[in-house]
């Protein structure tokens, strides 16, 4: 039973947490009401630390689309939130940029997510 539950959670997380595979972040933002983007890089240790925390938030907030964007692979996407440090988390609502923070602290990320849902 525990294994099946874990698989279901992974499937749900997969639907809620998207890995950017092409430079289409602008389209994702336009098509979804609320979006939280984690800008990261493979070499970024703090980015790797935050990824499971982002997955946790994705499971808890099914009204929000969470996206992980490799900032080196998709440099144009960085311009949407003026990203200059990693990890950076940016929020968008109804296609508009709301806010961004550069953090490796879960509480700060949670506050950012709450801000987009309450705005």
List PLM regions with ranges.
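Structural micro-motif
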Residues: 81-91
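Non-catalytic, surface beta->alpha helical segment in thiol-disulfide oxidoreductase systems
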Residues: 91-119
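Thiol-based oxidoreductase modules, predominantly thioredoxin-like and allied folds used
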Residues: 19-20, 39, 51-76
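N-terminal leader/targeting and pre-domain segments
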Residues: 13-35, 108-119
